């Protein structure tokens, strides 16, 4: 059976936690157009790394077979 292919776009955006049971991701909306967003919003809410939601985890794992 041939090797499974990894979706490279997903590989750049997601990584496993230390235990490998969960998947980490960056929060959206902190790339550009930042002038009108408050410093508190950018620092506290958008800077945190968060986990992929349980309902989306299956799809992410299909895109990353060797995660």
From Swiss-Prot:
GO terms for cellular component: cytosolic large ribosomal subunit. HAMAP family: Ribosomal_bL35. Residues 1-11 have a biased composition (Basic residues). The keyword Oxidoreductase does not apply. The keyword Ribosomal protein applies. Coiled coil: none annotated. GO terms for biological process: translation. It comes from the Bacteria. Keywords: Ribonucleoprotein, Ribosomal protein. Belongs to the bacterial ribosomal protein bL35 family. One of its GO terms (molecular function) is structural constituent of ribosome. NCBIfam families: rpmI_bact (TIGR00001). Residues 1-22 are annotated as: Disordered. This is Large ribosomal subunit protein bL35. Pfam families: Ribosomal_L35p.
